[in-house]
Amino acid sequence: MVCTYPDPDVVVFFAGTSLMTSLSELQQRFLNIATDGRLSPKQKSNFLALEAEACIPYMPISEALREAMSDGVICDMFEGHAPFKPRYVLPDYAKFLSQGSEYLELPSAEDFDDALNMLTIIYHHVPSVTNIPVYLGQLDDVLMPYVGDQTEAQIYKKLRHFWIMLDRTLPDAFMHVNIGPTDNIICRTILRVDAELKQIAPNLTFMYDESITPDDLLRQATKNICDCSKPHIANYPIHANAYGGARFGIVSCYNSLPLAGGSNTLVRMNLKEVAKRAASRDDFFSNVLPTYHQLMTELMDARSSHLHEQSQFFQGFLTQEGLIEESRFAPMYGIYGMAEAVNLLLEKEGQTSRYGQDEHANALGHEISATLAKLVDSTPVRYGLEGKALLHAQGGISLDLDVTPGVRLPYGNEPDPVTYVQATAAHHQYYRAGISDILTIDETVKSNPEAMFNLCKGALNAGYREFTANVASNDLVRVTGYMVKLSDIAKYEAEGSRTNTTFLGAEAAKNTGILERSPRVVSQEMSPVYK
């Protein structure tokens, strides 16, 4: 038996039930996981399962693509060598509650308690790349029909218990709840509970629509950011228009995807590495970028074809009971390293302009985003949403070294928040599947939360799809998009953590410099593998 791990060019062999000496390194890796005192038994099981997936021979790809992946230009996000589940799944939970489930032997929900109980059950049957659901639903829309004569106090107590249950039984900060844009008791209660508990999980997005959402509700959401760096605030009209209505959700870290569908795979391109291989700006746009775009398309097609044609995933109960539709899944076309790409291309021209610091450099970045959007829109894929992939400014992973997530400005060199927004807002129109800029704000904003409210409204009015901020003194912060506690990172090496994303945060803090984000006073004018 041949085992390819983790690089497709590294081959080891099984001989009957015993292992040859060449497997000692692989065995040692398994043993390291099994004896790692920082991991719980469940976390060890998950990592060992990932190692097993990595031993499956990689699906057929061209030598050019294999070389691009080996060189770090293109990355498959460690999703496994033979995909058997989509990366992100967004079931229609409202439909589930209204019809019940034959597979789960559940009748339709009749009241609030039924609804919470049924959601608690189905969440354990929704797969994702992390094995924990990344989408828990637009919970106010899902739960409001079942409120009945519940008092505010009763709703608060039940939702608080529900929130604690989510963090303790599904401890992964990629798990995401959506609320808003309407004003209702579920939305306000979730904001209250989230601010009180300050949990890593679940992640939370508040949908904002200027024509629907009252200012005092947005103020409650931005006050929460001051207290616990949540929620993430999404520009509802822009997202809804991108999907022809309201059938979408925000999941994981800033991924906007079709409801009752999701993402079959996420592949990403390192723009820094692409720019390195270009002789000039013209060469970048005319030759190098289109070449790697075709390789990106090849990898998305290879991975999604295996999932849709060989894994049998879409024969399961989620599809059979109408909670997801195969046609509503699409590959995510991720990019990162925009800052480094722009700076490298300008250096090749002998220019000293820097991304995020002057209009000339920023304009080049916007041109790259526009070109990527045209390439993605003009290129059909085998299993896409209406035949297309979805462009996404990918938020980075814990293993990234010397490269900035998505189109963000480099850590530690950010200008004031207003300048930051002005530099990056023009990118947002191009990234249908989501984009993020994490602004780090000085703790003095806590004494002036109106400043956070005004900054948020200004960013959304400038065209931001999503607004996200960390407050410098908060223990609970965003890393690439998921939440971690700085106190957990500090003690992780010695004690481990109950929460699945703490190791990613610890690794990211060490490798990417995320904790070097520059806090700015608002009034100055704004992993995936075991190691």
Question: What does each model-identified segment do?
Answer:
Residues 264, 330-333, 367:
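Short, well-structured alpha-helical interface segments that form or flank functional binding sites
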Residues 325-341:
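Conserved phosphate/anionic-ligand binding catalytic regions in large, soluble enzymes, centered on
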